[in-house]
Amino acid sequence: PCRNLIFLSYALGLAESIYLKSKKKSEIFVGFKCEGTESYPDTTKEFVSAMNKLGRVSCTTDFTVKAPLIKKDKEDIILLGKKLGINFIKTFSCYIGKKKHCGYCLACKLRQEGFNWANEKDPTKYINSIADDKI
């Protein structure tokens, strides 16, 4: 709960620190995506707007949080990644925090479904295979 608020608070603090040292303004990019009708409250356009407002009132310069994928679902992102030549082995989705994807958490399930919906082979090595399980 509220983990994106915590992550972005750290990112704003880091961006502020970089700005104070180098006078280089930073933009903060997040990978929020659409989950159909089930968006998490801290991955919405309203949340991004609120974080931008928080940055304006709490930092010495105006930082912008950007969410370029916010209207795309996993399938769209995987197809875009393929088009851009992304090595999906180097991407990570799992919530559990191990070195490998667990295969059971919601993020792992959505990752597998995204590759399935995009008709792409999932190159991910999962600790637990849930190929027959559904979300």
Where are these regions (language model features)?
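Nucleotide-activated chemistry modules centered on ATP-dependent adenylation/adenylyltransferase
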Residues: 1-135
